[in-house]
C-alpha cells in the first residue's frame, strides 16, 4: 500500500487503516514510504512491515481508548486492541501534530491493550503536549496494559524512542508480560514538567528489561537529597516482582535503576551519573544485584532497603558512599564488591524511602 505519488508496485490502498480493515487475520501488510496522516486501530492478527521512509503522523490524535486500570481517556496513534500475534516493524510513529489541548485524554504512541505481539525496528517520537501542559502526566511512547482477567504478551525490540513527555516504555498490570530489549530510550533532559521514567514495568506486570540504552531522564527541581520532592528514573520497577534487568546501559537521572518490588535480578548493567540519589536503588526483599558496573552516584552508588538481598561482585566507582544499607533489615549478603574512588565503602543510615517521590506511569 502507498500514498506516495511515486509508484509502489502492487499497492492497493492509500490508507493503512483501509488495508487493516480489509485484511484477514494472519495477513501481511507492506507499507511503502510516505506520510500517513491517520490513527490506526488493529484488532486482528497482522504482520505490518514498513519500508524506510514510512511515517505515521496523525493530523490529530483524539481519544480512541480507555485505560483499563484508571478509566482515563487514551489518545493513541496506534491502538492494538484485543488482538494476538500482531507484528509492527519499521514504522516511524510521530505525535508532533497530536492537537491535544489539556491533560486529558492521555497521549500515547503505540498502545497494546489485552493484546500480544511485537514492535520492532520502530521509531516513536514527539509524544508531548504543548509547553503550557508540560506538567501533565501524559505523553508515553509505548504502553502495554492488561485488565479484566485478560493478558498481554508483548516484545519491544530495536526501537528508538525519544521526545516523550512522561515515559518512554510502560508495561503495567497483572497479566502483562513484557520483553523489552535492545532499544534506545532518551528522555528530554532537565524538565520542570512531568517527572520522566525511561522504561517502566509496574503494578504486578512481569517481564525482562535487557540490553537497552536509557538516558537523560531528569526532573530539574530535584537537586539535593533533603529537599527533593520528586525523582526521575531511567529504569523503574514499580510494585512488580520477579523482574529481570540485565545488560542495560543507563545514565543521567536522579536514580538510574529503581526497584520498588521483590525478587528482582540486576546483572551486568552499567549505570552512571545519578545526579542526586543512586545509580541502583533496591526497595524490597530477595533481589540479586550482581556483576554491575556503577559510576558517579550522587548520594551513593547503590542503596539497599529490605531483607535477604544480595549485592555481589559489583564494580563501584566514584561516589561519596559505595553502598548505603538502610538500618533495620536482616539477611542481606554484601560481598566481593570492588570499590574505586569511594569515600566510604558501606554505610548503614536510617531509611530514606523514595516510593512516594517517584511518579510511575499508570
Predicted feature residues:
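Right-handed parallel beta-helix/beta-solenoid
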Residues: 1-22, 33, 47, 361-362
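Parallel beta-helix/beta-solenoid
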Residues: 24, 43-45, 51, 82-83, ...
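Glycine-centered, small-residue-biased loops immediately flanking beta-strands
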Residues: 27
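Short glycine/acidic-rich loop motifs that flank beta-strands on beta-rich extracellular proteins
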Residues: 36-39, 52-53, 57-61, 75, ...
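Hydrophobic "rung" positions of tandem beta-strand repeat architectures
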Residues: 110, 119, 142, 169, ...
Amino acid at each position: 500500500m502507498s500514498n506516495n505519488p511515486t509508484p509502489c508496485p502492487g499497492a492497493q490502498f492509500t490508507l493503512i487503516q483501509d488495508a487493516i480493515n480489509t485484511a484477514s487475520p494472519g495477513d501481511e501488510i507492506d507499507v511503502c514510504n510516505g506520510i500517513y496522516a491517520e490513527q490506526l486501530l488493529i484488532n486482528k492478527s497482522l504482520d505490518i512491515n514498513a519500508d524506510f521512509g514510512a511515517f505515521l503522523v496523525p493530523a490529530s490524535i483524539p481519544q480512541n481508548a480507555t485505560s483499563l486500570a484508571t478509566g482515563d481517556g487514551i489518545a493513541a496513534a496506534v491502538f492494538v486492541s484485543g488482538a494476538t500475534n500482531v507484528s509492527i516493524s519499521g514504522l516511524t510513529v510521530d505525535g508532533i501534530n497530536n492537537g491535544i489541548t489539556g491533560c486529558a485524554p492521555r497521549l500515547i504512541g503505540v498502545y497494546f491493550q489485552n493484546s500480544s505481539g511485537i514492535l520492532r525496528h520502530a521509531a516513536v517520537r514527539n509524544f508531548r503536549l504543548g509547553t503550557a501542559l508540560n506538567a501533565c502526566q501524559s505523553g508515553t511512547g509505548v504502553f502495554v496494559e492488561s485488565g479484566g482477567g485478560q493478558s498481554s504478551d508483548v516484545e519491544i525490540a530495536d526501537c528508538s524512542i525519544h521526545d516523550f513527555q512522561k515515559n518512554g516504555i510502560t508495561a503495567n498490570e497483572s497479566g502483562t508480560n513484557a520483553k523489552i530489549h535492545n532499544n534506545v530510550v532518551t528522555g528530554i533532559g532537565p524538565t520542570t514538567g512531568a517527572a520522566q521514567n525511561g522504561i517502566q514495568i509496574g503494578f504486578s506486570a512481569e517481564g525482562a528489561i535487557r540490553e537497552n540504552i536509557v538516558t537523560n531522564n531528569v526532573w530539574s527541581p530535584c537537586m539535593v537529597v533533603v529537599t527533593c520532592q520528586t525523582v526521575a528514573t531511567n529504569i523503574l520497577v514499580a510494585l512488580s516482582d520477579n523482574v529481570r534487568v540485565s545488560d542495560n546501559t543507563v545514565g543521567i537521572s536522579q536514580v538510574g535503576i529503581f526497584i520498588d518490588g521483590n525478587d528482582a535480578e540486576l546483572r551486568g548493567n552499567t549505570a552512571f551519573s545519578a545526579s542526586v540519589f543512586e545509580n541502583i536503588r533496591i526497595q524490597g526483599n530477595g533481589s540479586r544485584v550482581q556483576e554491575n558496573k556503577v559510576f558517579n552516584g550522587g548520594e551513593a552508588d547503590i542503596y539497599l532497603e529490605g531483607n535477604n538481598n544480595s549485592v555481589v561482585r559489583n564494580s563501584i566507582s566514584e561516589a561519596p558512599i559505595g553502598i548505603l544499607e538502610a538500618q533495620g533489615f536482616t539477611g542481606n549478603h554484601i560481598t566481593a564488591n570492588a570499590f574505586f574512588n569511594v569515600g566510604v565503602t558501606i554505610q548503614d543510615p536510617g531509611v530514606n524511602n523514595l516510593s512516594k517521590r517517584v511518579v510511575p506511569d499508570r
